Design a protein with these regions (language model features):
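Catalytic/RNA-binding core of pseudouridine synthases
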Residues: 1-206
Length: 206
């Protein structure tokens, strides 16, 4: 099932709602942060066993990044930790060029990655500073849609597991909005909470 998640609820809340409505075991092929919107690919019943076929698919996003400040979480929900002068268009393009292709990016502290057996975001909430590991990501597309004032809107296509918030931080800002538009061959325009895609049909598109 393809669902267009609105900003606000967690991905797990969307999964739980479908589980309540269907009474079937339900999972997902990649979460979205609560502040983010866009495409979730949900798996129900026996299809949950096929999660590995979908989790590793590339993702596409549109994001608005505020280049005047970094936040503690890389999104609008965190505290401002640094004020910055927005870069010129030429400097922005230089920063973008460094992030295209294969890159190593620090995993955000406000993430579900486990550090010493505990979720990183729980450590961050308690004010415990830890050295976050990096993750190798592949950035296929990183294009400017618009750049006005301190706000840049980007279209980006990245490998599974890439944190767009980490890209925003590397550019010298934080995500104000984030919308997932594609998961592999599936697009947000196809999202319909009332349509169940048969597993065979979904697999045939990969």
């Amino acid at each position: 099932m393809l669902v267009d998640k609105p900003p606000g609820p967690s991905s797990f809340a969307i999964v739980a709602d479908l589980r309540r409505r269907t009474g079937a075991r339900t999972g997902h092929a990649g979460t979205l942060d609560p502040f983010a919107s866009g495409l979730l690919l949900l798996l129900s019943g026996r299809a949950t066993k096929l999660a590995s076929c979908f989790v590793g698919l590339d993702k596409r996003y549109v994001t608005d990044i505020d280049l005047s400040a970094r936040t503690s979480t890389g999104d609008p929900e965190g505290d401002v930790v640094e004020r910055l002068e927005p870069p010129s268009e030429e400097e922005l393009e230089r920063r973008l060029a460094r992030l295209r292709g294969e890159v190593e990016l620090p995993i955000p502290a406000a993430s579900a990655v486990k550090i010493g057996g505990e979720r990183a975001y729980r450590l961050a909430r308690r004010g415990i500073a830890v050295q976050m590991p990096t993750r190798r990501s592949r950035v296929e597309v990183l294009d400017v849609i618009s750049y006005t004032g301190a706000a840049v809107r980007l279209d980006l296509s990245v490998s599974s597991g890439t944190y767009v918030r980490a890209i925003a931080d590397a550019l010298g800002g934080h995500c104000r909005t984030l919308r997932r538009t594609e998961i592999g061959p599936f697009t947000v325009d196809e999202a319909d909470p009332n349509r169940v895609i048969p597993a065979e049909e979904a697999l045939a598109r990969l």
